[in-house]
């Protein structure tokens, strides 16, 4: 059985540059890792009170975003854009102790 994680990125578009918004949009969509049987759904919006995450850092040069849950800021996530079909997701504690290996996800069509 697949584990499904919803990530609702909450941010104010008026405070971001066009390049930063474009960078975030690279990650919007449905992604899956068939080997680990994990799927993630990344979207923008605060239309739900569940699974809300705020963006901590946007690295437009490396197409990377760092974010954490609004409910639990101790764990941070890093998304790296690999290509149009693949992203990498890595988790770590806010103090930087205990960083996980990146997990590769493939875009679901």
UniProtKB/Swiss-Prot annotation:
Pfam families: Staphostatin_B. Residues 97-101 are annotated as: Binds to staphopain B. SUPFAM superfamilies: beta-Barrel protease inhibitors. GO terms for cellular component: cytoplasm. It is found in: Cytoplasm. GO terms for molecular function: cysteine-type endopeptidase inhibitor activity. Its main location: cytoplasm. InterPro entries: Protease_inh_b-brl_dom (IPR016085), Staphostatin_A/B (IPR037296), Staphostatin_B (IPR015113). Keywords: Cytoplasm, Protease inhibitor, Thiol protease inhibitor, Virulence. Belongs to the protease inhibitor I57 (SspC) family. Forms a stable non-covalent complex with prematurely activated/folded SspB. Specifically inhibits the cysteine protease staphopain B (SspB) by blocking the active site of the enzyme. Probably required to protect cytoplasmic proteins from being degraded by prematurely activated/folded prostaphopain B. Also involved in growth capacity, viability and bacterial morphology. Inactivated by staphylococcal serine protease (SspA). This is Staphostatin B. It comes from Staphylococcus aureus (strain N315). The lineage of its organism: Bacteria, Bacillati, Bacillota, Bacilli, Bacillales. The gene is sspC.
């Amino acid at each position: 059985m697949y584990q499904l994680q919803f990530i609702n990125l909450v941010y104010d578009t008026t405070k971001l540059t066009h390049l930063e918004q474009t960078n975030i949009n690279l990650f919007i969509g449905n992604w899956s890792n068939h080997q680990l049987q994990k799927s993630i759904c990344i979207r923008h919006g605060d239309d739900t009170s569940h699974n809300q995450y705020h963006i901590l850092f946007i690295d437009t040069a490396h197409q990377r975003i760092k974010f954490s849950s609004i409910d639990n800021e101790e764990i941070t996530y890093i998304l790296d854009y690999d290509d149009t079909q693949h992203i990498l997701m890595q988790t770590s504690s806010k103090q930087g102790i205990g960083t996980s290996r990146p997990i590769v996800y493939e875009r679901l069509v």
